[in-house]
């Protein structure tokens, strides 16, 4: 786990920092909405053999570590945040075939049709629909024909959720996590994927239980949860933010979930 001072967002006050980086400051490693279970589901379906893998916005590098454990031919992380990029470099070791570039997912600078799998978690949700589509099209551009794009994001249910309810959820999320989160329904994620040039192969849905004890034990272990609780007790400003986030997640529990999708480039 990187030192707290090395975690992105530590230069911002607790009331303004993005929620996921506050959780990282507490020692939370898994910051994805569907937890390790969704990440493992994605990787088990998208990875295998001597393949070339790209990961968009690897963050703390937890999934990057899981990817390189599977010994792909190459791994390329793409992260706009230089602190995050440095953390991931520390995770993946000194293999010359495993690298991290400091770039944005909308314009990676990577060559056309050169990779077998792109992985992206908890980053499309934070974009407008226009920017979501731009990132998905960038994934399509760098993938070889038939390549896989594995994504793990926030979702809304049901598909016929009223627009005013969807807007209320988006506003509450933005206020609590200080990021302009725009989750989509399964139907909306599917339409966007198809517009970007993909077909949906498989879908996994689970609860958005990021801050619930059962999920935290599954993701962090008992010792990890104890460390997080200890740090929460010592940092009242962060504790207030975290409790606010959990309150929003619980308030909208009937409509917020986590989704994993395995997409294939047409």
Sequence positions of predicted segments:
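Short alpha-helix
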Residues: 181-196
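A short glycine-rich, Lys/Arg-flanked "PGG" loop and its adjoining helix->strand segment in the class I
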Residues: 133-148
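A short acidic, Gly/Pro-enriched loop at the edge of an enzyme's catalytic core
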Residues: 106-118
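Conserved alpha-helix/loop element of class I SAM-dependent methyltransferases that forms part
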Residues: 32-50
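Conserved Class I S-adenosyl-L-methionine
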Residues: 202-266
């Amino acid at each position: 786990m990187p030192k707290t001072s090395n975690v992105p967002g530590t230069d911002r006050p607790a009331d303004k920092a993005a929620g996921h980086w506050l959780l990282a400051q507490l020692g939370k490693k898994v910051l994805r909405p569907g937890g390790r279970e969704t990440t493992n589901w994605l990787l088990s379906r998208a990875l295998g053999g001597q393949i070339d893998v790209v990961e968009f916005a690897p963050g703390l590098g937890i999934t990057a570590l899981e990817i390189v454990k599977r010994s792909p031919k190459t791994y390329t992380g793409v992260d706009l945040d230089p602190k995050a990029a440095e953390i991931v470099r520390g995770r993946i070791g000194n293999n010359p075939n495993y690298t991290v570039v400091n770039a944005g997912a909308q314009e990676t600078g990577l060559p056309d049709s050169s990779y077998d799998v792109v992985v992206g978690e908890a980053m499309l949700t934070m974009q407008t629909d226009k920017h979501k589509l731009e990132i998905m099209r960038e994934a399509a551009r760098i993938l070889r024909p038939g390549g896989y794009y594995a994504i793990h994001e926030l979702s809304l249910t049901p598909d016929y959720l009223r627009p005013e309810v969807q807007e209320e959820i988006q506003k509450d999320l933005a206020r609590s996590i200080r990021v302009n989160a725009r989750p989509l329904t399964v139907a909306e994620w599917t339409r966007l994927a198809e517009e970007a040039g993909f077909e949906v192969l498989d879908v996994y849905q689970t609860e958005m239980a990021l801050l619930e004890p059962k999920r935290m034990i599954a993701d962090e272990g008992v010792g990890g949860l104890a460390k997080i609780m200890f740090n929460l007790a010592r940092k009242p400003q962060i504790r207030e933010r975290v409790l606010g986030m959990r309150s929003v997640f619980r308030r909208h529990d009937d409509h917020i979930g986590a989704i994993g999708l395995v997409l294939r480039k047409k």
